[in-house]
Amino acid sequence: MKSEDLETKVKILKDTVKKLETRLQTVEDVEAINKLMNAYGYYLEHWQEDQIIGLWSHRDDVELEIHDTGLYKGYEAVAKSFQFKDHYTAFNGEKTAPPEYLHILIPNAGIIDVEPDGKTAKGRWYGSFLGALRRGGKLRALIGCGIWENEFVKEGGIWKFKKLLFNDIISSPLDEGWVKTPYLANPPANDRPPSGPNTHAQTYPSGYIFPYHYKNPVTGK
C-alpha cells in the first residue's frame, strides 16, 4: 500500500470518528436537556423552590414567562418568582408549598434542537397538568395543558435553563371541564411583581398557534 493511500485512509477514519463523536455528544446533550425538563416537572409537584431555582443559569439575560403571571427578567427576578409566599417545611426540612398544594406538570412530546456549537439549545414540549390549587380563595381540583418553548445554555458541561416560556392552553376546574371554563386566571402575587407583561397568553378556544422554534422537519419551511 502506498503511503499516500494510507494517509488518505487514516484521514477518512479520523474524520469519521470526529463526526461520530459530534453525533454522540448531541445525543447526550438531548438526553441531559430532557432530564433537566423532567426534573423541573417533579420539583413543581410540591413546589420545591430551592431545587427549581437550582436548575437555572445565573446569567443576567435569563427569562421566565408563565402565561398570565408576567415576564421575569434576570436571575434575581426569576428566583424570586418561584418563592412561595406561605412556606411549609417538609419532612426533610425543605421549603415547599403547603401539603394540600398539588402541581403535577408532565413534560411530553419534546422536540430539542442543539446548536452546532453545542453551547445552546431550544426545546418545545407539551405540559400536561393535574393540580389542587387555590383560585379565588378556594382550593380547586384543576386539569390543564400548555406548551413550553424554552432555551438552554451549557455551562461547565451542565445544561441549565436560560429562558422558560409556558403558554397555557387550558387550566380548568375538573368538575366543569375546559369547554365550560377554559381557564381560571392566576395573576402574579403582589410580592413578586413581574418585570413586564406577557408576550404570549392565549388560551382555548382562541385558535392561537404558539410559535415554533424549529422548521418543518420534512419540508424545511
PLM features per residue range, with description:
Residues 130-142, 170-172:
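Short, cysteine-centered beta-strand-loop-beta hairpins and adjacent loop/turn segments enriched
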